[in-house]
Amino acid sequence: EIIKSIRDFFDSNDFTLCDSPIFTPNAAEGTSTLFGTDYFGNTAYLAQTGQLYGEAAAMAFGRHYNFGPCFRAEKSKTRRHLTEFWMVEPEIAYCDINENMQWAEKLLSFILENVLKHKTKELHILERNIEKLQKCTTPFPKISYTECIKILNDSGNTIKWGDDFGS
């Protein structure tokens, strides 16, 4: 239901689906955690993202999304990092951060609404508390990066302004 909802949301909001290649000739954003393989005498890599293709498609179509597999050869000591996963990557030409957050809220709300409407039985089988999901409504609370740094530092974490939050 989640995958169906993602596709339905983007299709009903005039996003164009463009699948990106799974084999690519280079890394995305300068990273080096790639799965490489011989590809007719050259090295090809399993794609980490369809972002490069998505950005070009967004400039052509205005709104675009890619939904496909991603591969990352990251060595991790946690179970939170997968080497293979599926990722949805929407791109909107000339979209600012506030519009981006609005689209994210709309997407998450749409998915939750459909899952709660069509998959309540499955949520109960998985022993999920649907009351928490029902409370997840828009607008979502928002804070600035600076406010977040202050909250983290006030709660005993040490993080400098400009640092990544990490995972």
Predicted regions and their residues:
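Class II aminoacyl-tRNA synthetase-like tRNA-binding/catalytic domains
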Residues: E1-A93
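Hydrophobic (often cysteine-bearing) scaffold residues that line and stabilize catalytic clefts
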Residues: I2-I6, N100-A104, S144
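Metal-assisted phosphate- and nucleotidyl-transfer catalytic regions
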Residues: S20, A27-L34, K106-S167
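Low-complexity, flexible helical/coil segments
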Residues: Y53-A56, T83, N100-K106, E122-R128
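Short acidic, gly/pro-rich beta-turn/loop elements at beta-sheet edges
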Residues: A56, K77, N98-N100, N153
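His/Asp/Glu-rich mid-to-C-terminal helical/loop segments that flank catalytic regions of hydrolases
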Residues: F61, V88, D96-K117
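Generic alpha-helical structural element
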Residues: A93-M101, T137-P141
